Each structure stands twice: as structure tokens, then as C-alpha cells.
């Protein structure tokens, strides 16, 4: 038995580690560093129906223990992704989770109805929580009724399981999660970035041209752990956890809090080998802590 294996809807993972969407492109650049077959899965960059240029620059800023970004879902559009990006990923055994975004419900439905045409795509990550886009995005992810309606619409056309990415920029994440689960979502991914800002002392203006950006990195990990624990306490829905993962202990903390698998985001920018490193270190750390397998860890969590 593979002690690191994870089975969740649409995804048979050889290990629970994957790069988060927006931090790995469509994998081509990282494939020059290591074999992508080592990964549990790949969360690909967000896709919208039409190409998007994203927000004006500057749109990235460093912060203490993290970074701000306001990329604005820059991507080449659905047709290009289907024709040129996803075919590259089909050579690997690693399951692909396609991140889908949009400004309207029709945008999401259009992409979700077709993204499964790629044999590499085993699941969809519904990006209803991106805080950078002025029209759509944040609105879908902060209203339980709107999130429920969108999830239901996407589920009616998707050919693969649907995981919904939750925004932490809400007063009650549990009510959002419950509404999405009631709409038929196969799983959740959480959390997306927290809204933040930095000021340039010389210009007296925000460093990010868009004003605000999404805060990611180690600074948000305690928030992610808390929110995953909250949702897990009321639901057994599969969860892919993310938010500030740096170390193998972070991975285990997410799993113990209630995640079934873990995505690594910002650290890919500072260490392109972070995912394979964590995969190598995980069984060693499990031995040190007396954890026989992730399956046993899940059972232990359920009995608490």
C-alpha cells in the first residue's frame, strides 16, 4: 500500500502534494527542473473564455512573510489553453486540476462545459474567490446564495468533478462552504488570498497599481488552518488545503486540521523544487511522528 496515497473525487493522488494554481503556470517551465510525474496533482493556471491581459503594473509586491499580487487572471483564453497548454500536460500521468474563472455565470459555464475535453483534466477548481478582479470573482465567493447558484450551474455541465475555491475575505466561511456543498460540489479548495495593501513612502500611494492585492505566503497560514478546521468540523466534503505552506510540518498541520491534500503556492517562486522536496520529506517526518499512513491519519482525525 502507498502510505501517501489519497483518493478524492476524480483524483487518485500518489501523494498529497501539488502546486497551487497561479504559481505554476501550465507546468512547462517547471518541467525543466524535475519530472512532473512526481507530483500528486497539478493545479493549472486560471482559464477564462477569452484572453485576458490582467491588471496594470506594478502588480506584485513583497511583504514581510509573504507577497501581494494583483495579476488579474492574465491568461491566453480557453481556445489557446485547449490547443496548446493542456496537450503538453497530457504526456504526464499526474492528474490536472483546471482552474476556471470568469466575470459572469455564463463565463464559468462556457469554460467548465469544455475544459474536460482534455484527457489530462481530471477535475475543475472553480475560482470564485479571486480578490483582484473588479467584475465578478469576489462577488461570487462572498454570497452563499450566489455561490450555490453558480456551483449548481457548473455542475450541470461539467464532465469532471468540481472543487470550489473559497475566499477567506468573508465573515462566515462555514455558511459559504455549506451552500456550495448543498449545490453538489465534489470538494473545496481553501483558502485563496487575503486582501492586503502596501504603501510606497515616497509616492504616498499604494505600491500595487490596482490599489489592493491578494496576500499569500506564510503570513496567512494560521488563517488557512483555522478556516479548514472550521469547515471540517461541520462537513466531510473533500478539502485541498493551501495558504502559506513552506515546510513538511506545514503539510502535516494542514492534514491534521482537516485537509485531504495540500497545495503549495508562493514558495514555488522562491524554490522551484519545493514540491518534490516536500514529497521526499513527508514519509520521513511521518515516521518521526509515528504516523503510519495518511489513511490512518484521516481515520484518527475522524475519531477525534
Curated annotation (Swiss-Prot):
Residues reported in the UniProt entry to bind substrate: 45, 69-73, 127, 192-193
* Pfam families linked to this entry: DHO_dh
Q: Which domain of life is it from?
A: Bacteria
- Entry keyword set: Cytoplasm, Flavoprotein, FMN, NAD, Oxidoreductase, Pyrimidine biosynthesis
Q: Which cofactor does it need?
A: FMN
Q: Which InterPro entries match?
A: Aldolase_TIM, DHO_dehydrogenase, DHOD_1B, Dihydroorotate_DH_1, Dihydroorotate_DH_1_2, Dihydroorotate_DH_cat, Dihydroorotate_DH_CS, Dihydroorotate_DH_I
Record pathway: Pyrimidine metabolism; UMP biosynthesis via de novo pathway; orotate from (S)-dihydroorotate (NAD(+) route): step 1/1
**One biological process GO term for this chain?**
'de novo' UMP biosynthetic process
Cytoplasm in keyword set: yes
Signal peptide per UniProt: none
NAD listed as a keyword:
yes
Positions of FMN binding: 21, 45-46, 99, 127, 165, 191, 217, 243-244, 265-266
- How is its cofactor bound, per UniProt? Binds 1 FMN per subunit.
EC number, as in UniProt: 1.3.1.14
Say what the protein does. Answer: Catalyzes the conversion of dihydroorotate to orotate with NAD(+) as electron acceptor.
Listed under subunit, the entry gives: Heterotetramer of 2 PyrK and 2 PyrD type B subunits.
Belongs to which family? Belongs to the dihydroorotate dehydrogenase family. Type 1 subfamily.
Q: Which HAMAP family match?
A: DHO_dh_type1 (MF_00224)
* Protein's recorded name: Dihydroorotate dehydrogenase B (NAD(+)), catalytic subunit
Species whose genome carries this gene: Listeria welshimeri serovar 6b (strain ATCC 35897 / DSM 20650 / CCUG 15529 / CIP 8149 / NCTC 11857 / SLCC 5334 / V8)
